[in-house]
Amino acid sequence: LMSGNTKSGISIYQFSLKETQTPGEYRYALTLVQGGERPSDFKGNLRFQVRLLQHDQRKTIPLIGKNSKQDFPVNFKFLHRLEESFNVPPNTTIESLQVKIYENNNSKKAIITQTAQPMP
């Protein structure tokens, strides 16, 4: 399943979320591709939102990167792969992880949005 933005040539080739062997740890993988004849470098940011259930309350929280920011910068020509993990407190159920892709010159409007549910 590919979702993309034909104007920019960017598309999500693969986006998955899995619970690891470690309780409360989830791993996600995202592969972005850029098509076209001679694509120029894509520069932008990714933002992730985690939808979870904790103590019978639904919450949506931003995923924070290693630099303590919500923006995960990307800069690539043809292919970009990101594989990271995050932890949640005990008694928390992850319902989904959403990624939004923004171009550098427009941080208000995402060019692509896709959601992944945890796979067993």
Indicate residue ranges for each PLM-predicted region.
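Membrane-proximal structural modules of membrane-associated proteins and complexes
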Residues: 3-120
